[in-house]
């Protein structure tokens, strides 16, 4: 299956000059969604993953079903103030300003084998921040997996030393 056929391209969203890769058409198509989840889960099946981590919000869409398929736990990474218990936090820069990501302090055990799963790799800023949170919690990142990678933005360079998988690659 060519997953790229299931991605809608929206020009000028969220602002002029951007060619937005819309995954809602992929997750709406039961065969494409299952294929994407199965491809990543298949890649992870022999890696003894304890926990799949998914960043808010679209990382939840792929991370949770992959964790279920593997028989692993799922850990959500949320924006500040969304988790009800003690958290670990990291501040990261956005194009205009900054934001804070958090996980529960007890969500990852020391030595847990972790797969980080998200929908899209662009500049790598958010992903590298999540990597720091996972490592701060004591997790061992086994692999970082994406449905889409925007190769021209060179996010993979911020993830050197990690095993990175992407199912679809776009030159923007």
Curated annotation (Swiss-Prot):
GO terms for molecular function: adenine binding; adenine phosphoribosyltransferase activity; AMP binding. It comes from Clostridium kluyveri (strain ATCC 8527 / DSM 555 / NBRC 12016 / NCIMB 10680 / K1). Keywords: Cytoplasm, Glycosyltransferase, Purine salvage, Transferase. Signal peptide: none annotated. Belongs to the purine/pyrimidine phosphoribosyltransferase family. Gene3D superfamilies: 3.40.50.2020. Pfam families: Pribosyltran. Pathway: Purine metabolism; AMP biosynthesis via salvage pathway; AMP from adenine: step 1/1. This is Adenine phosphoribosyltransferase. GO terms for cellular component: cytoplasm. It is an enzyme of class 2 (transferase). NCBIfam families: apt, PRK02304.1-2, PRK02304.1-3, PRK02304.1-5. It catalyses: AMP + diphosphate = 5-phospho-alpha-D-ribose 1-diphosphate + adenine. It is found in: Cytoplasm. GO terms for biological process: adenine salvage; AMP salvage; purine ribonucleoside salvage. SUPFAM superfamilies: PRTase-like. Its EC number is 2.4.2.7. The lineage of its organism: Bacteria, Bacillati, Bacillota, Clostridia, Eubacteriales. InterPro entries: Ade_phspho_trans (IPR005764), PRibTrfase_dom (IPR000836), PRTase-like (IPR029057), UPRTase/APRTase (IPR050054). Homodimer.
């Amino acid at each position: 299956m060519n997953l790229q056929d299931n991605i809608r391209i929206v020009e000028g969203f969220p602002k002029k000059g951007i060619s937005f890769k819309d995954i809602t058409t992929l997750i709406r198509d039961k065969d494409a969604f299952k294929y994407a989840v199965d491809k990543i889960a298949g890649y992870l099946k022999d890696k003894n993953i304890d926990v799949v981590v998914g960043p808010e919000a679209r990382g939840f869409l792929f991370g949770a079903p992959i964790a279920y398929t593997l028989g692993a736990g799922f850990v959500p990474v949320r924006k500040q103030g969304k988790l009800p218990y003690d958290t670990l936090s990291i501040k990261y820069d956005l194009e205009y300003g900054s934001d804070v990501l958090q996980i529960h302090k007890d969500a990852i055990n020391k030595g847990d084998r972790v797969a980080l799963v998200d929908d899209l790799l662009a500049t790598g800023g958010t992903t590298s921040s999540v990597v720091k949170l996972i490592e701060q919690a004591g997790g061992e990142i086994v692999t970082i997996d994406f449905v889409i990678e925007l190769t021209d933005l060179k996010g993979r360079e911020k993830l050197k030393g990690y095993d990175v998988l992407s199912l679809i690659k776009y030159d923007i």
